[in-house]
Amino acid sequence: DTPWHIRDEGIYSLEKGKTHYTSNAGLKELKVEIDHYLDRHYGVSYDPDHEIMVTIGGSEAIDAAMRAMLDPGDEVLIPQPSYVSYVPCAVLAGGVPVIIELKAENEFRLTPEALEAAITPKTKLLVMPFPNNPTGAIMEKKDLEKIADIVREHDLYVISDEIYSELTYLERHVTIASLQGMRDRTIVINGFSKSHAMTGWRLGYACGPRIIIEQMLKIHQF
């Protein structure tokens, strides 16, 4: 269950009449705190006014990002096993899902060799589902650096689904957005469902370059 100190704040907000429309991108106060959290924990910072948007859970953020970034026929690289919504989101956005099978002998991590083999001239986007659902696999910094080199070389974009970032125990989570040259080609997806036991509250967020977040906001609005 959601911890009581969070529920109490929700009750307080209802009692105070905080039930009206907000900015399309979410409460400014929340976006400022999201930026502080990402900067403090992962060394990456975003402009709360233009580079962060609050979404209806992480799933809406994934959907909006794909709709904003994909043209018809663009290929989306999706490592699997992974969250079941990536493929339908890509299809609904007009993209073509390309599955990269993650293997047990590699601890279900995405390898540079597997990534290179999947890239074609039509590849636009790579989904990075780490920490992974359902395998629990993580990508260490040294792993991410090799992936980032390939992403930059092929001028790809990344959707980094980091909803399980607080549920790592042996290695501290590293976001690929914090690596050299990756912030402006990565959309970081996260939220409060897993870290704060708030699955039913549907509270997520996306962070990334202003030009992409602005397009995602149009989709979020309409």
PLM features: residue spans?
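Active-site phosphate-binding strand-loop segment of PLP-dependent enzymes
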Residues: 98, 102-172
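N-terminal small-domain helix-loop-helix segment of the aminotransferase-like
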Residues: 1-57, 64
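Conserved core segment of the aminotransferase class I/II
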Residues: 179-222
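A short helix-loop-beta submotif of the ANL/AMP-binding
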Residues: 91-98
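A short helix->loop->beta-strand "cap" motif at the edges of active sites that frequently abuts
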Residues: 74, 95, 151-157, 182-184
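Short acidic capping loops at alpha-helix termini that bridge into adjacent secondary structure
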Residues: 46-52, 72-75, 122, 183-186
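Conserved PLP-anchoring active-site segment centered on the Schiff-base-forming lysine
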Residues: 68-90
